[in-house]
Amino acid sequence: MSQLVDVPARGHQKVAIDIDFASQTIIGRTDITVNPIDSNLQKIVLDCYQAEIHSVYVNGDLTKFSYSDALKKLRIDEPNSTVNQHHQLNLQYEALMNDLGGINIFLSKPPGDELRPLIVSIDFSVHQPIFGITFVGIDPVDHRYPHVFTNNSIIPYSTCSWLPCVDGIWERSTWEFEITLPKTLSSLMHREKTQPSDLNNGANGVDGHDDNYENNRFDHQFNLSNEPDLLEDHDIEVICCGDLLDQVTHPKDMRKKTVYFSVTTPVAPNYIAFAAGPFKHINLTDFREPEDDDAMGSSAIDITGYYLPKYAEEVENTCVFLYKAMDFFVREYGSYPFNSFKLCFVDETNFPIISTPSLVISSNSILYPKDSLDQIYDSTKTLTWALASQWIGVYLIPKAWSDLWLIYGLSYYICGLFLKKLMGNNDYRFRLKKQVYRLLELDIGKPPISQRNINIPIDPNTLDFIALKSPLVIHILERRLTKTGGSLGMSRVIPKLLLQVMSGDMLNGCLSTSHFLKTCEKASHMRLDVFAQQWIYGYGYPIFRVVQRFNRKKMIIEMGIDQVQTKEAPRAPMSDKNFLSDAIRHLNNESIPTGLPVFSGPMTIRIHEADGTPYEHVVELKDSFTKLDIQYNTKYKRISRNRSTKNVKRDGDHNGDDSDYVIRSLGDVLQSDEDIERWHLYDYTKEEEDTMATEAFEWIRVDADFEWICDLRVRQPEHMYVSQLQQDRDVVAQLETIRHFTSESFTVSQQVSTVLLRTLLDNRYYYGIRQEAARALARCAIPELDWVGYYHLRMAYLEKFCFKDSTIPKSNDFSNITEYYVKCAMLESFPNIRDRKGVTPSSVKKLLLDLLCYNDNANNEFSDAYFICLLIDSLVEGLIPRGETVQYAFSDPEHMEFVNQVINEIDRYMRIDACMPSFKNIITCKSLKAKLRLAQTFHLEFGPKELLPYTQEGNYVLVRCIAFNLMLQAGALKYTPLIKYIFYILTNDLSPVVRRSLLYSVQDGLGALARGGTKSDVASEDLIVEEDITKAVEKRIDITSRASISGAIEALRNDLGQNHDFATEIWNAINNPKSDLLTKRNLLMICRVLYKAKSSLLVTLKIPSLIPRLRAIHLGKGKIVIKKAPLKQITSKTKEKSTSPTPPSITINPIKPKGPTLKIKLTNLRSTPPSH
């Protein structure tokens, strides 16, 4: 990154801007205070691109400067350049990322020995920015409220896209802002030209900016006729990071106002943000109870929510909890680092959360109305993390990019602790364990969370992985600090770190991994070197296989813990999302890292012995195999643990004698003889019960205190897992049991299905466990068990949610939110019921269709939009066979008739959603996905042509993004007109959200093509099956080769890499100045995968193009002379003037390979350039 030459990190910057909505222009001046430490300072370098620099002053004197726009510079202007020169452009990009620069200011005289501060003043303007600042509702076809906001992030070079500065996360300074804008919406809509602004009342104003900026403005009125509410006049508010100082009327234009802000806490330009528009506001601290207000006293912080009109109810409903989060963080981690907290909701932001000092800009997409249930947790977690990042992320920042994991880990960790207080310990531990299971799927061949060489800007998939693993690492570190070290753990470490920032002991507020570990070591008095090497700088995770045996002679439990991660390491799965990054790593010859052979550390083993007492044993793992001899403690008769609770003795019924007695446990529902017969329940037999009674202990839990991120499997009998599920009150233990029941190594039984059913119907269980039990019942729905799992699941659903002896559902009632979530989990489980051929039974499909057809939400106070989407998804999933059967799914006429019924029902819901839109049009989005899946499986007419109308402007943004993604998954890159259309949208669409989403969709589409196309091409003609053994063998070889990353790259190069139109369009998009830096970077990565780099260039020689010909001359008297005719010069056509791009007309014709053609010409030059 560029830096001010010899300028300390902390300085001061003043920014004065005038916002013109009509022309999407910002005109401004910035004053940067430079404190030189070199008396011979001759040049100052600032970061800036996408702006126009009009003049530069140093201490009031006009100064020479040079300016180079990175967006315009990052291109190859040579007209004969091709996509094969992508490596040359990539070198330019890497150089820019290391030192963006842009503005070079040449000092007329050095500061001298006095080293007085220099005031660098820059007059600049930004017209129709494509990155950094977003204007919404300005275009005539856009009927949303006009507003503008900064669209930056922690990623470098976002703020300098509209403001000259030293753009780096470590370049912190104090700030002042003067923002001039219209007072009201009617003033904003006024058409007359804006007068030149005097932003700083003369002295530091913009003097003589170019008139071209006035002449090039959009000459149109805002078209708001279709939105009657928009015609109401609203005050234009500006919300900025820092503190509001003053607001005055503009001295020259009474329709404008100037608002003043100050940021007294030094922050980097990445954390500078503002938003302006017709925002309303709500004081979210009004929801605080009076007693809570008194308890907080002077520590109470004001929280204000800003929103566009019509979002008042959604903001109140979504943010009602925020004052509790603020109070929690203040009590636990010290005073809030700023004076107030503001939350502003806007449209069209690429990031769900943009955190800056005292201000968070958030997307309207995280808001939800009162009748929506499914988004509650996700939105609550997102906003809680946004607030947590004020302490850790804005106030406390990483010292290097390799320390970024700490910021994500600590902020998400304290976010989770608040959610634990808000939603309960069971919810916290359950979700934490689910995150571990998710990590086990993803952390295969992944780099460490602390990477020395990380590519900037950081890939979103990498950030998501860091955000997932980092808080889990902090959690297990907390467990070890509190258990082994005997300290208060993170509850002491985090406040100490924040106190060091406040006191100035932590330089510039930058936290490094080494400093964090040293602080933890001081707090716990234990060394963390080994922990850091394994979990922070190491790869992978341990895989434990535990065996145990009770030795009756020695009265000990012999146990062996084997680490098998080097033997049973799962293969890294290929996916569409990860294909591009995997391909780049392959081309860089980066080997897939393997996990460590041995992970060491303490582990807690809890043995529930026969008397019902749990005994804990802490062991230290040091080797790949650890052998343990654990002393057995029980000397009394065992307590019968209620496996068959048919004849349950109540507490106290044993009359004080020493005989066995039964303790009631969870899952003791459906115990009567009538229930057992009606529900087809199976308990253990008397012989099995007697065998179980001889066991020395009830069950064993390894890693009982959740101190490890690991794949763990304990070898113990089925009935011990049943005891663990029914008698262990820890939701993690219950979740581990159900996960064991669904593992491939476990053989299910009718008794397990019975236990899962009772778990599902017992509302004393945490609802997440009931959901998992519902999903696990599908595992028991197999012919070998007479489909008992299906019978149990079906009976449970019909009993709870349908009319008696019918598959017609009752009217929806979602007032009990836990029952609603369990109901949804049961529906998700139905399509997983399969026969030996991978086909869902017809009764399951008919049940799901009835539930969809007869869904009734008339008497429900909550929306059923998500529920309908779930029904559609489950029904479509059930229709699609798995395994080899999918190839012949279209051959059954009866099944195809049922498929058509499903499509008709989906179309009905799409028509309803068009007339009465659901929340975010989610029904339309889900229906499009469902229809494409059916089309690809059953060879129906639904593909890019049918999806195209949904991609056009006027549709909801989410619908457009989904439609583009589905088009590319359906093979849109096979059609030349669609290739041109896609890249036109990628560089010219008004919506930054659509542009960014389309970029990632193109990457996913490449992954789909590389891994085997689009399942089956969508065809309108009858399918022709050719019984050709050779072709079948070739197809099998092609599928096998695409399974490896090298084979997938080669196949993609032979397919899409030979498409000249794609090569032309992607190269034009890369060289287009409208493409932002991230888009250029990702497209260059695609080029590297598709095309081999060539350091050669076609040279065009300016010589006449001549065509020789012969002519016959009749001399008379039968004499003919054949001579060489005068050479005719071919005039070259003049190139037409380039005009503004227009959307290409689209006629979808599949690209057909051309056959070989032999051409013979008499010419002195080739008409086409030679291949090279």
Swiss-Prot record:
<dbReference type="GO" id="GO:0005634">
    <property type="term" value="C:nucleus"/>
</dbReference>
<dbReference type="GO" id="GO:0005669">
    <property type="term" value="C:transcription factor TFIID complex"/>
</dbReference>
<dbReference type="InterPro" id="IPR027268">
    <property type="entry name" value="Peptidase_M4/M1_CTD_sf"/>
</dbReference>
<dbReference type="InterPro" id="IPR037813">
    <property type="entry name" value="TAF2"/>
</dbReference>
<dbReference type="GO" id="GO:0000976">
    <property type="term" value="F:transcription cis-regulatory region binding"/>
</dbReference>
<keyword id="KW-0805">Transcription regulation</keyword>
<dbReference type="GO" id="GO:0006367">
    <property type="term" value="P:transcription initiation at RNA polymerase II promoter"/>
</dbReference>
<feature type="region of interest" description="Disordered">
    <location>
        <begin position="1131"/>
        <end position="1172"/>
    </location>
</feature>
<comment type="similarity">
    <text>Belongs to the TAF2 family.</text>
</comment>
<dbReference type="InterPro" id="IPR042097">
    <property type="entry name" value="Aminopeptidase_N-like_N_sf"/>
</dbReference>
<keyword id="KW-0804">Transcription</keyword>
<dbReference type="GO" id="GO:0000785">
    <property type="term" value="C:chromatin"/>
</dbReference>
<dbReference type="GO" id="GO:0003682">
    <property type="term" value="F:chromatin binding"/>
</dbReference>
<dbReference type="GO" id="GO:0005829">
    <property type="term" value="C:cytosol"/>
</dbReference>
<dbReference type="GO" id="GO:0032153">
    <property type="term" value="C:cell division site"/>
</dbReference>
<keyword id="KW-0963">Cytoplasm</keyword>
<dbReference type="GO" id="GO:0016251">
    <property type="term" value="F:RNA polymerase II general transcription initiation factor activity"/>
</dbReference>
<comment type="subunit">
    <text>Component of the DNA-binding general transcription factor complex TFIID.</text>
</comment>
<dbReference type="Pfam" id="PF25316">
    <property type="entry name" value="TAF2_3rd"/>
</dbReference>
<feature type="compositionally biased region" description="Low complexity">
    <location>
        <begin position="1145"/>
        <end position="1154"/>
    </location>
</feature>
<keyword id="KW-0539">Nucleus</keyword>
<comment type="function">
    <text>Functions as a component of the DNA-binding general transcription factor complex TFIID. Binding of TFIID to a promoter (with or without TATA element) is the initial step in pre-initiation complex (PIC) formation. TFIID plays a key role in the regulation of gene expression by RNA polymerase II through different activities such as transcription activator interaction, core promoter recognition and selectivity, TFIIA and TFIIB interaction, chromatin modification (histone acetylation by taf1), facilitation of DNA opening and initiation of transcription.</text>
</comment>
<protein>
    <recommendedName>
        <fullName>Transcription initiation factor TFIID subunit 2</fullName>
    </recommendedName>
</protein>
